Amino acid sequence: MESIPLSPFDLQGSFSNIPYAFFYENTQSENDFMPFDFLKGSLWASLQRFPILTGRLRARSTGHIVVEVDAGNPNQPDIRETLCDSVHWSQLKESSFAWDAWPAGVATVGPVATAAADGEIKLLNIHVMRLAQNSGVILFINIPHYVVDGVGYFAFINHWAETMRMQQQQQEQENEARSRFSFDRGIIQRYLPTERAPLDPLTASIYGQRNLLVDWLAWLSPTTLGGLLSKTAAMARGEAHLFRIPRASLDQVHKDVQPYIPASARLSDNDLLVALISKTYIQSQPQPKPPTGFLSWLRPGQGQPESHCTVRIPCDVRRHLKVRERYTGNLLLGMMVRTPLAELARPTSSETLAAAALNVRQSIERVQPGLVAAYHDLIQANPTSHMRPLAFTATRTTTSLVTTSQVRFPMYEADFGSGKPCFVCLTPVFAGSYTMAAILPTPEGREGGVYVLLTSNVEAMQGIKKNQYWNGLVEIIW
């Protein structure tokens, strides 16, 4: 048996699931389109390279979790196949794959990792749903954040697809070195530098300040924590929409903000998108009074109104640490972008958007090896602190949000032998009342612009859809 201790990076949001659905059209009307036996057989072969996905989560001490991998007694993935006679591929295509057009039951898990019938949290859930008249397949795949981030998730999906494709063609897979993946958490320590850079005051405060309620959550086992958080997640009601920003519109925004930024500055698409989403969100709703009663316990400085908007941006730090291995565990640093509410509330124009985007750029440029090391040390020294961001977000539901850019993920590469997916998207379990924006690639790649899958509370979403500047840039897909 192998015991894999999860790293401080693994514990950030570890209880949340990564639930995507991949849509495949049976263009050739193949009778054996993506056969289940082949999917299942190639899955077991693929797991030889990803044994951690057959492990069991175990709490070893306060705030410390390990994955126990027993090759002789694996934690079997939940893989199932169903047939949906009521929904044809053409219906999904006509609706632009809108969530409300999906057949019921595509996602077999919720937003939080919970125990299955056997009492274990499955580290891999797969649902193969065949559409009416064998017109296509929806492939739902979920992996909890405990063991992978987005890089690791798509590395597994694409490896599985390649394995099945090679098996169908009766070919050997490409050289072993290329398909070698690492889940050794010890890699992180080897790449951390000796120097340390100071964390920003907010991050240091969130993780360094004890909070009895959320620290207590870190004492719970993964199964108990999942059961508790899933009940609270079920109470959250929000509204979600998929927007598209065409490439031409993004390019025009870059040109329009140019006069308002220093000649040496270079803004990325993501800088502009985070700024645009933040401004549109803050302008969408009135700010409530600070929380009182029970929720006020979660928040220091009771009774003080919030003066800043906080955007949490998960940054993949493999490049910053120069990690050479194909590491599949979590290596995300949650950068906090703080902007005065008054600044974001100013009507959006090229000038005000440029100012907000420069603030995003300056925050992201702080990511360096020394900062990554300081963040790692802080969580490691305070094992229960990984739950503390929950207290921050729970008391700032209208002034904080998460934006995650996934445009670099190879979402549309998973060809199981019958073609690549026509559409890939997070599932409706992503929707909630807390504001999150996932910036996704389109099937056309960079030339197609980007999708923005945005979920928020109902009041904010109504304001967002009425925002004049926002509507001038985006197309609402559904």
Curated annotation (Swiss-Prot):
Catalytic residue list: 145, 415
Biochemical pathway: Mycotoxin biosynthesis
GO annotation (BP), single: helvolic acid biosynthetic process
Induction: Expression is under the control of the secondary metabolism regulator laeA.
Enzyme class (EC, first level): transferase
Keywords on record: Acyltransferase, Transferase
Family in the record: Belongs to the plant acyltransferase family.
Name of this protein: Acyltransferase helD1
